[in-house]
Every structure is written in C-alpha cells, then in structure tokens.
Amino acid sequence: MTWKDRLPAVRGKLLRDEPLAPFTWFRVGGPADVIFLPEDEDDLAAFLKALPAEVPVTVLGVGSNTLVRDGGVDGVVIRLGKAFAKVEPRGEGRLYAGAAALDAVVAREAGKAGIAGLEFYRGVPGTIGGALVMNAGCYGAETKDVLVEAYALTRAGERLTLSNADLGYSYRKSARAAAEPLIFLGALFEGRPDDPAAIEARMAEITERREKTQPIREKTGGSTFKNPPGHSSWKLVDEAGWRGKLFGGAMFSPLHSNFLINTGEATAADLEGLGEAVRADVKAKFGVDLDWEIKRIGRP
C-alpha cells in the first residue's frame, strides 16, 4: 500500500494519474500522481494537515507561467477552483481577491469599483496566487506596489496572514515563498480612488498594446526569461538569432522573442531544450545570464 492508497477523506475531488497538459497554457506535460480540487479553504487545510509530510505538494493555477515536464509530477498537485476566485471591494480603496481569481478579472473589478493602481493586472496572465508567489507585474508596476497582505496555508495546513514586508519581494520573487512552501488563499490590495471610465481607458490601452506585441493567442507561458540587470531579454534572444527558429515543435515567437510557444506538436522537452539552448548561446555571445521566469516542474 502506498500513500496514494491512504489519502485523507475530502469534500472536493481527487484525481489519480491525471494528465496535466490540459491544465497548462503550453498544453504539454505528463500526469500528476494525484490532483486535488478542494471544495473550500477548510477542505484544503484539513487535507494538508492529514497528508503525510513526505508527500510533495505543488500548486498549479491556470498554468500560464508553468512548464510541466513530460515525466509528470510527483506527489499531489493542488488546483484551486471557483471557491477561491472571489473578488470583492472592501471599501477605502481596498479589494480582496482569491488566489484563483484571474489577474485580468481583478483589474476589471477594481476598475468598476473606482480603484486605480491595479490596471497592470490586465496585462498579466494567470491568477493572483501566482502573482503573489513571483511578484508579477508589467509596464512598470508589480504586485508589491499594491499588496496590503496575503493569506496562505503552510504545507502543514497552518493559516498565515503575511504582510507585504513579510513576503520579501524583489524582481519576480518572494523570498518568503522561495524559502517555505506556501499555498496562497487570497490577498488584500489597496489602490487609489479614480473615475472608473478613466481606469477602463488605461486598461484598454494595455490590452491593445499586448495584442499588438505579444502572441497572446498562441500556446505560450508568457515571458520566458527575466530581464537581466541593464538588458531586455527579448533583445538578447533576438540579437542571438533565435526569433522564429523551430526546435522540434517549439519556437521563440516571431512577434515577441521572449515568448516561447508550442507550435502544435511540441513536447515539454522541446520547449525546455530550446530555452536552454538560447540561454547557452546568449551567455556565449554576450556574457549575460538569462534566468527562467517560467516555472518548470516535474520529471523529465
């Protein structure tokens, strides 16, 4: 008997040996040992408390910034659903958003409530949970600029309230989330009052800019590499000659050369292999290290 045969009782759903490709924007990747779809926060907390400590736990949002390797993922993959996607104004320029709420929905609801400052989320793929993990942002704004506090569970199911400072944010990183496995439940944000029409106009500009410059309708995971200090990743990839080059079924987009795309039949190995080839070439030609922004998980 293995740990999979003695999983804790839950009110949500447990899926065994389920392919993860349909759960990611790249549409690649092997199966998870177990996928857990919790009914609510209490269901999730109880499950984590009862799950043997040696079982790995991975949280997967909408899979926008994640590359699941072809061998699949050990342990339990947690996928948060509608119960974790609530978005509601809290008064005084504040807004609560669940970890499963899409970033673009958070931007929209903030705008409708006359809360400015969260417009940048219109241009960020994925969910608030992922944004909290990596201090997601774009166009000169990022999560730490608007976060008041975040709510999370530890691997042991303990509830935490974490201030902005507690999370130790820097460029595309939370020191706290990097040091300790956290399952984010939601967060409280604070903006400033503004006219909803003016906010919507700014978000429309962001949408137009994205559609013109990014391959948002392709099978992609968003920005592939972080920008190194003093450099733009897209420019380094472009100048190294990788824009539009095929590697198996993988390619760096002709529209934006920091966007890795699945042209249709790519494997996770194709996508990661192309990324690593580009990293090596950029290092050799320019002496600059490109660090992955896309999270790569699982067995090769």
Curated annotation (Swiss-Prot):
Primary residence: cytoplasm
Gene Ontology biological process: cell division; cell wall organization; peptidoglycan biosynthetic process; regulation of cell shape
Any GO MF annotation of the entry: FAD binding
Active site per database record: 172, 223 (proton donor), 293
Top-rank taxon: Bacteria
Family under the similarity heading: Belongs to the MurB family.
Protein name in UniProt: UDP-N-acetylenolpyruvoylglucosamine reductase
Native source species: Phenylobacterium zucineum (strain HLK1)
